Amino acid sequence: MAMSSYLINSNYVDPKFPPCEEYSQSDYLPSHSPDYYSAQRQDPSFQHESIYHQRSGCADPPYSSCQGPGQPAAVISPRGHVLPTTALSTPLPEPSHHCDSVTPSPPPACGQTPTSQNTSTVSSRKDPVVYPWMKKVHVNIVSPNYSGGEPKRSRTAYTRQQVLELEKEFHYNRYLTRRRRVEIAHTLCLSERQIKIWFQNRRMKWKKDHKLPNTKIRSNSASTNSSGCPTLCSNQSRASGPPPSL
């Protein structure tokens, strides 16, 4: 804790004052009679003697009379400022506060609409802020009067951020569950169908890059082979069997 320098310094000497008895015995405070103090309270223009002791013996300049013909005499303040009696005698006017009565406007008729209120409400309303992630990506708007077949779907253009997130998900898992697909669609503001199609196309590309056989083609060939085997086997058994008896 920091201490003051005069407490640390041992050479500091306390100031010594004379005792109280010396003040009463000596002439430090001049003794006055009780009438002296009562006269000070009664006389408002009393000034202390020290003010006059400060002045050297120069004479005060004579003051000219401020009283004109037909005017009352002016009052000189103790500091030498001239105060006219008219300013002292006339009271200051009190500020008057006039409150105008506020009459409420009559309500509009039943057939009329308050246009001013509508304009104020319209001006107070602001356009809602729509962020990019709140918008749906490439949603085709079909007119209600369209009576043709199903409109052609446009190709979805994924953003760089969406592609990056989908690539990271594909790196860890090439097949998504329904629950995970819903989570990704909600995070990237896409539909489940768009996520499903993107993963299908990405798996096809991955198989093509790694030169893997297509599972759809292989399954089709296996089904044709399994369906054609019974006919071939029956023909072979008939050819290899004994000749018919006469």
Curated annotation (Swiss-Prot):
Keyword DNA-binding among record annotations: yes
SMART domains the record matches: HOX (SM00389)
UniProt-annotated stretches for the region Disordered: 23-125, 210-246
Coiled coil: none
GO annotation, cellular component aspect: nucleoplasm
Swiss-Prot/TrEMBL keywords: Developmental protein, DNA-binding, Homeobox, Nucleus, Transcription, Transcription regulation
Span of the annotated motif Antp-type hexapeptide: 130-135
GO molecular function annotations of the record: DNA-binding transcription factor activity, RNA polymerase II-specific; RNA polymerase II cis-regulatory region sequence-specific DNA binding
Function: Sequence-specific transcription factor which is part of a developmental regulatory system that provides cells with specific positional identities on the anterior-posterior axis.
Cited PANTHER family: HOMEOBOX PROTEIN HOX-B4, HOMEOTIC PROTEIN DEFORMED
Protein name in the entry: Homeobox protein Hox-B4a
Organism: Danio rerio
